[in-house]
């Protein structure tokens, strides 16, 4: 039997998980090189978002994300146990637009060839794809001015 006579195995269609779709969206729209960068940056964007919203809202968002993807909910809550705990007890922070973006640039290790505001917008877009419109609107209410505009545009 020659190679042309060997029947090919049926190709399995593997559907990407919501978490993988989220990461892929951040990679493509943010101009990143890897899922690892997307994951690390998204975690810092989420951390900064949580800092400007009440704990109750943050917990509701985590629960909504958990219904879509446990890994995405885990990322929202924070993979760092100490930071996750602090997010539950600290008051809402007042963060200006430039500080919001600077935190992402500095804390997330955004690659030098990537604009922090662009990758933030990519995380916003990917997040809004999995959230209800009601939750997206509620988040917007707590974001500072220019950041809110970016969230609404995403």
Segments predicted by a language model, with ranges:
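General marker for long, soluble alpha-helical cores
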Residues: 2-154
């Amino acid at each position: 039997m020659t190679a042309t006579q060997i029947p090919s195995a049926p190709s399995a269609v593997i559907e990407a998980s919501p978490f993988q779709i989220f990461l892929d969206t951040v990679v493509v729209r943010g101009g990143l090189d890897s899922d690892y960068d997307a994951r690390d940056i998204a975690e810092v964007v989420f951390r900064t978002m949580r800092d400007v919203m009440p704990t109750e809202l943050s917990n509701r968002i985590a629960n909504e994300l958990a219904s879509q993807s446990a890994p995405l909910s885990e990322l929202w809550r924070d993979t760092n146990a100490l930071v996750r705990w602090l997010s539950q007890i600290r008051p809402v922070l007042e963060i200006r637009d430039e500080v919001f973006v600077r935190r992402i640039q500095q804390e997330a290790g955004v690659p030098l060839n990537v604009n922090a505001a662009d990758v933030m917008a990519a995380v916003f877009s990917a997040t809004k794809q999995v959230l209800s419109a009601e939750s997206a609107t509620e988040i917007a209410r707590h974001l500072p001015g220019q950041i809110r505009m970016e969230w609404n545009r995403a």
